[in-house]
């Protein structure tokens, strides 16, 4: 293997392992966030049974569905997240070579900053093309509030993918893809762009204390998550459309979804579950720091 191929493989492995560990740890927070986001678009959750907030959700889930249901959809998330994060990190470095080749970060700060934004956004959008059906399945499995057996909408990852494909074809598995690309570019641009720029401004980036790296990463993930959160809410709502027919269809398209959420639920509805997303972002920050630490040993 060439040095470039070895470097790419190391990036892929380091990013994937770091992501799998952190996502499993924050899976319960992830499910709470998803339920708060999509409950208005769920056929299983009637108006009188909707969750009032994070605490209500955390208390009711184990009572109604069992403690293990906090990890519902986690297998799909880990399977999805391994290639997603690994591809993000691997492509990020490749795109950095394209956008930042020959750029001096000390004398060309804004060009350096813009290059980091572009490489981060392009990496996120590229990887999304490959793993979107898994992200879709993870959302639908996490939104499934049935206790067991016949009450469940899907029996598992494979059952979810097969049922939606039979019902809506490949288009059903990519429902909400367009708004996802918009959101992912905004999120990844901040996630990678600001983080790399901040790290690059430190006197000795490779020997920065892990706590400083974590603080930078934590701030970046919180800002990036809140900035792109409305896009995430809309894409999750659109994902809930797949498999529906006739009058069960709530939104005719992405723009209609934006309009109806704003009109019927108010602007704050775009940010439902956002606080749990900030907590979940601690896992994202941990991924960035862990990735840098793993790379030191590869």
From Swiss-Prot:
Topology, Mitochondrial matrix side: 38-74, 131-178, 232-273
Regions that span the bilayer: 8-37, 75-99, 110-130, 179-199, 211-231, 274-291
Region span, Important for transport activity: 235-240
Catalytic reaction equation(s): ADP(in) + ATP(out) = ADP(out) + ATP(in); H(+)(in) = H(+)(out)
GO biological processes: adaptive thermogenesis; B cell differentiation; chromosome segregation; erythrocyte differentiation; mitochondrial ADP transmembrane transport; mitochondrial ATP transmembrane transport; negative regulation of mitochondrial outer membrane permeabilization involved in apoptotic signaling pathway; positive regulation of cell population proliferation
UniProt cross-references to SUPFAM superfamilies, sorted A to Z: Mitochondrial carrier
Binding-site residues for ADP, renumbered to this chain: 80, 92, 235
Modified positions (N6,N6,N6-trimethyllysine) in chain numbering: 52
Positions where N6-malonyllysine occurs in the chain: 23, 92, 96, 147
Key words, A-Z: Acetylation, Antiport, Chromosome partition, Membrane, Methylation, Mitochondrion, Mitochondrion inner membrane, Phosphoprotein, Repeat, Transmembrane, Transmembrane helix, Transport
Activity regulation details: The matrix-open state (m-state) is inhibited by the membrane-permeable bongkrekic acid (BKA). The cytoplasmic-open state (c-state) is inhibited by the membrane-impermeable toxic inhibitor carboxyatractyloside (CATR). Proton transporter activity is inhibited by ADP:ATP antiporter activity.
Record-listed N6-methyllysine modification sites: 52, 147
Residues modified to Phosphoserine: 7
Modification after translation (UniProt): Trimethylated by ANTKMT at Lys-52.
Motif (Nucleotide carrier signature motif): 235-240
Chain positions found as N-acetylmethionine: 1
Protein's cellular compartments: Mitochondrion inner membrane; Membrane
N-acetylthreonine modification, residue list: 2
Modification type N6-succinyllysine: residues: 43, 105, 147, 268
N6-acetyllysine carried by residues: 105, 147, 163, 166, 268
GO cellular component terms, semicolon-separated: membrane; mitochondrial inner membrane; mitochondrial permeability transition pore complex; MMXD complex
Family indicated by similarity: Belongs to the mitochondrial carrier (TC 2.A.29) family.
Domain notes: The transmembrane helices are not perpendicular to the plane of the membrane, but cross the membrane at an angle. Odd-numbered transmembrane helices exhibit a sharp kink, due to the presence of a conserved proline residue.
Function: ADP:ATP antiporter that mediates import of ADP into the mitochondrial matrix for ATP synthesis, and export of ATP out to fuel the cell. Cycles between the cytoplasmic-open state (c-state) and the matrix-open state (m-state): operates by the alternating access mechanism with a single substrate-binding site intermittently exposed to either the cytosolic (c-state) or matrix (m-state) side of the inner mitochondrial membrane. In addition to its ADP:ATP antiporter activity, also involved in mitochondrial uncoupling and mitochondrial permeability transition pore (mPTP) activity.
Protein name: ADP/ATP translocase 2
Organism (species): Bos taurus
């Amino acid at each position: 293997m060439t040095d470039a191929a070895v470097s790419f493989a190391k990036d892929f492995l380091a990013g994937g392992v770091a992501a799998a560990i952190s996502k499993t740890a924050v899976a319960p927070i992830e499910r709470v966030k998803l339920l708060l986001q999509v409950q208005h678009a769920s056929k299983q959750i009637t108006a009188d049974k909707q969750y009032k907030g994070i605490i209500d959700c955390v208390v009711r889930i184990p009572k109604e569905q069992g403690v293990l249901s906090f990890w519902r959809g986690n297998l799909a998330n880990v399977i999805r997240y391994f290639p997603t994060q690994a591809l993000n990190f691997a492509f990020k470095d490749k795109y950095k070579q394209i956008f930042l080749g020959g750029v001096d970060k000390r004398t060309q700060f804004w060009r350096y900053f813009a290059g980091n934004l572009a490489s981060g956004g392009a990496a996120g959008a590229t990887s999304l093309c490959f793993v979107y059906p898994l992200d879709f399945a993870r959302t639908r499995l996490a939104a499934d509030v049935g206790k067991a057996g016949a009450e469940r909408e899907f029996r598992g990852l494979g059952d979810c993918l097969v049922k939606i494909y039979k019902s809506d074809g490949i288009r059903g598995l990519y429902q909400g893809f367009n708004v996802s690309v918009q959101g992912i570019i905004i999120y990844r641009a901040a996630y990678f762009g600001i983080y790399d720029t901040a790290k690059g401004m430190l006197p000795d980036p490779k020997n920065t204390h892990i706590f400083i790296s974590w603080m930078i990463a934590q701030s970046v993930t919180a800002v990036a998550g809140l900035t792109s959160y409305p896009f995430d809410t809309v894409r999750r709502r659109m994902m809930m459309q797949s498999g529906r027919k006739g009058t069960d269809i709530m939104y005719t398209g992405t723009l209609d979804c934006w309009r109806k959420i704003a009109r019927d639920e108010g602007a704050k509805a775009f940010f439902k579950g956002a606080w749990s997303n900030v907590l979940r972002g601690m896992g994202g920050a941990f991924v960035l720091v862990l990735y840098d630490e793993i790379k030191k040993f590869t």
